[in-house]
Structures are given as structure tokens and as C-alpha cells.
Amino acid sequence: MRKIILASGSPRRKELLELASVPFEIVVSEVEETIGAYSSPSDIVMSLALQKASAVAENNSDHIVLGADTIVTYESRILGKPSNEDEAKEMLQLLSGKTHEVYTGVAIIAKEKTVTFYERTEVTFWELTEEEIDTYVASKEPLDKAGSYGIQGKGSIFVQNIQGDYYSVVGLPIARLVRELKQFDIDVTHA
């Protein structure tokens, strides 16, 4: 029987697959992520998700491989994971009191076909004080997250409004993924 392999070490993606009762194994993609000249954030996340999944699929061609990538954008500026605490603070100051977009791309690779898709979610932050930002960054939570915040953690208190898929902001649009997996004869809704 074919296995589902998650090409990611993200604990959040692992938790979401477990939440949906999707049986899977983890093989972390060691691919060097490269962003070419893409026209849109959706193209970027789908390309990065495909790069990750393709790298793992090379050695797992009999299985179904999932790759995913998430970025945050604000006024056409891409906000990935911060490289240090100062950059995290800058990102949070930029997002304070404003609406930004979160894009998560997913790639599903199997022998018979490859499917890519993305979800776009708008997130609005409350106005943040310098003290709130400093305290949050000192917690280290934002340092491994696109846009420097975790909506499922302490960063949740910054969110005033969300339009779209909450789980996509966490890192994996799980409801859409479950539906897309049906194309590969995987139906966890009847498990």
C-alpha cells in the first residue's frame, strides 16, 4: 500500500495531518529553496512546495509525497522567516494595525500525477505596542515562522480579524488537502 510522506519537519504541519487522521510518515526535504522570477506569491509558494515534494519523491516514487510552503505578504513585500530578533521586531511593527496576506502552497506528487494548489488568507492585526512586540519576540516563538508570528500560539492575541482558512495560516490548508487527496484514492473521511 502506498504511504503518504510529508516532506517537512514542521511540527505544525505534522499536528494538522494528525488532527485530520491522515496516516503519514515524515521525510524532511533537504532541498535548498530557490525563489525564481515568479509573478505572484501564489506561484512562489506552489513552486517552493513542489521543490520540497520533488526532492523527497525522487527516493519515494511508489508513494504520495506532500510538500508545503507558507509566506506572508504585505504591500507586495514577502515576509519569510526572520533571520534574527531585530528582523522579527521589524516585521511585527510593519504588520501592526494592518491587513496582510498569508499564502500557503501545497504540492502532492504521485506516480500518476502531480497536483499543486494554494490558499490565500487575509489577516488583520490589532495595533501592537513596542512592549508587546518585545515580549513576544523574547519568547522566541516568532523566530521560525513566516511573518514572525504563530497564529496558533502566543501570536494569536495580535489577530483582530481573519478572512479565509485559519489552518492555512498555521501552515497547511487541511480541509482542502483532504479533498485533493481523494484524487489519489485516499479518503480519510471514512476512516
Swiss-Prot record:
InterPro entries per the UniProt record, alphabetical: ITPase-like_fam, Maf-like
One GO process term, biological-process aspect: nucleotide metabolic process
EC number, UniProt record: 3.6.1.9
Record site: Important for substrate specificity: 12, 70, 152
Gene3D superfamilies for the chain: 3.90.950.10
UniProt-annotated location(s): Cytoplasm
The entry's keywords: Cytoplasm, Hydrolase, Nucleotide metabolism
NCBIfam families associated with the record: maf
Function: Nucleoside triphosphate pyrophosphatase that hydrolyzes dTTP and UTP. May have a dual role in cell division arrest and in preventing the incorporation of modified nucleotides into cellular nucleic acids.
Family membership noted in the UniProt record: Belongs to the Maf family. YhdE subfamily.
Record protein name field: dTTP/UTP pyrophosphatase
Gene name tied to this protein: maf
